[in-house]
């Protein structure tokens, strides 16, 4: 596999998954096409893509739930499916089905017992996790899971994914179905895990959340990785200035501002030229600066543009 200066916790090389369908199994669906990527220790990595892009298939392949048709993958230095690795990773599925007659506390005890965590450790670990994910301890002891809201279920799901204190955590659509407050709280949990040095790999189609918390991202569409990198690498550095000016003459401002237009009693546009020179020239134009901000394309704009270039839409 690829050598890097930073330690990698996850690597894939030409990973491919093909399903056979039809009565005679003579039709092929390529769910993953030669996916190659690296996730480094301690980073938060976001996998983006429209519905049906293959995000969950890739994640389940990495977890050993789905067997790849071809290609290779390493997790924590071992081949996917290695039993010793399973003790060191956590997983939150998108659509989790828990035994809902258990209380939240009993459920976490069950998961802890699967990992053979001693009772003495459980007594300390479970309250810590409940505090981390924002679930009341008494509620977790008394209330059955079938009485939990969507947000509470997501929190208990995150807690079970962390019960074994994993080095690498997989989240499948952790913000799915949550209201803005719930999404904010899950983002805060992920940021807390990041500060603890955990490596986080998650799927999402909520681009604003990914943009706020990820160190690097990958865009997956129709099973193919279209790009992998940091936001600066993918979107480019923010070296374009958006300017808003009050007053001044249009013919003079046009020499400095590209796409000059009048809106809400101000001139708006994109600065061409050096900011210092523009600021020095403002007084001679009898104009006053309202704002001058660095700007770049949003992740959403980039995402839609990449899909359109390839004739793809989010509904496909």
Question: What do these predicted regions represent?
Answer:
Residues 13-15, 35, 260, 292:
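Generic beta-strand hydrophobic packing signal
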Residues 1-18, 25-28, 309-316:
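ABC-family P-loop ATPase nucleotide-binding domain
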Residues 240-310:
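Short, charged/small-residue-rich alpha-helical element at the C-terminal edge
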Residues 10, 17-202, 207-208, 212-221, ...:
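ABC transporter nucleotide-binding domains
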Residues 84, 235-238, 307:
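Short, flexible helix/strand-to-coil boundary loops that buttress conserved ligand/catalytic motifs
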Residues 187-272:
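ABC transporter nucleotide-binding domain
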Residues 5-7, 42, 238, 264:
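Sequence-level motif detector for i,i+2 pairs with an aromatic at +2
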């Amino acid at each position: 596999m690829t050598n890097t200066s930073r330690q990698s916790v996850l690597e894939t090389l030409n990973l491919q998954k093909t399903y056979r369908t039809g009565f005679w199994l003579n039709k092929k669906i390529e769910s993953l096409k030669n996916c190659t990527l690296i996730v480094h220790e301690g980073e938060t990595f976001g996998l983006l893509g429209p519905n049906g892009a293959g995000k969950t298939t890739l994640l389940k392949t990495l977890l050993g739930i789905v067997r790849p048709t071809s290609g290779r993958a390493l997790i924590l230095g071992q081949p996917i499916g290695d039993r010793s690795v399973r003790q060191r990773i956590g997983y939150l599925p998108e659509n989790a089905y828990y035994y809902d007659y258990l209380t939240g506390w009993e459920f976490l005890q069950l998961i802890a017992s699967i990992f053979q965590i001693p009772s003495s450790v459980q007594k300390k670990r479970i309250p810590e996790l409940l505090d981390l994910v924002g679930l009341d301890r008494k509620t977790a002891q008394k209330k059955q899971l079938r009485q939990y809201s969507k947000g509470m279920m997501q929190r208990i799901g995150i807690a079970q994914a962390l019960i074994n204190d994993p080095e690498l955590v997989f989240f499948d659509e952790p913000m799915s179905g949550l209201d803005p407050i719930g999404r904010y709280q899950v983002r805060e949990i992920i940021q807390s895990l990041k500060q603890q040095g955990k490596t986080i790999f998650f799927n999402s189609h909520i681009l604003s959340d990914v943009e706020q918390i990820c160190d690097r991202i990958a865009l997956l569409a129709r099973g193919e990785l279209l790009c992998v990198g940091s936001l600066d690498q993918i979107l480019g550095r923010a070296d374009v200035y958006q300017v808003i000016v009050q007053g001044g003459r249009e013919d003079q401002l046009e020499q400095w501002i590209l796409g000059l237009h009048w809106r809400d009693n101000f001139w708006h546009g994109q600065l061409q030229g050096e900011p210092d020179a523009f600021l020095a020239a403002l007084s001679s134009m009898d104009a006053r600066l309202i704002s001058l901000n660095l700007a770049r394309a949003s992740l959403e704009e980039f995402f839609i543009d990449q899909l359109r270039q390839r004739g793809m839409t989010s509904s496909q």
